[in-house]
Amino acid sequence: LQVGYVGTQAHRLLASHDLNYGQAQPCLDLNQLSNLTGDASLACGPFSADSAYTIQPGEIPAGFTLHLPYGPVSSVTGPNANPITLVGLRKYSSPNCNPLTGAGCPPDGVPVFASIFAEDTIGNSNYNSLQISAEKRFSHGLQFQAAYTFSKSIDDASSFESELNPLNFRASRALSLFDARQRFVFSYFYQFPHYGLHGFADKVLNGWQASGILTFQSGFPIFITSSDDLELMNSVFFTSAGEPDQVAPLHRLNPRNPLHEAFNIAAFQPGPVGAIGNSSRSVCCGPGINNL
């Protein structure tokens, strides 16, 4: 019998993040301005980060503040004496564009840059486990080995394909997608006794052996993401940066029942507009694995 602890920490792991995600506040301001003025061309919402907008002179009411994604100032408070031009709502949508004068803004209304993804060594992870093993060496025709692991793995990104929360990298920290909380493996070999038989009976009844491997493992975490762009970032690489709101505990259902999903999907609802939802990047856990 052996009992041991195994733990690791890793730093500077490869992870992806968006350097040029859509700015939510300018989009929210534009949409509010559209509602106030009735100017439908200023309507802004999901997947609008690469759209172009022109605010006419005097269109911003007195006291209303419009946040700008780029330019010499961070915001403009109405009333505005001159038109304001926005080509894209990302920090680097149009690097040479001055929204206050229109100078350097793409005349075709198409931003110079959309998302700019970087793969940097900024990820972290840790793993802790209790490992127990027992072995019976071959005697009296029997040999077996059993191993049990109770572990937990946490990381910021389980692979470079996992996009970090661009507003807060640490908010992406969650269960590793390959985390298997419990795993039990049992292997055995048994040689049946040799009976003192002869002829046909000897050939049929003697020389039999039985062996096998049994594996029982808890399910992997469920990767949670939202692709409706309610966070107004329009940031999609291998996955989306968006998360829904988790409004109830996750309950695993019977996936073998054709009337069931793998879990109660009603536990997740669309998050607030202009913000990433409160759900963790991964939630424990999906269906387990039984291999006999």
Across the structure, where does each feature detected by a protein language model lie?
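Short, solvent-exposed micro-motifs at the edges of structured domains
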Residues: 1-292
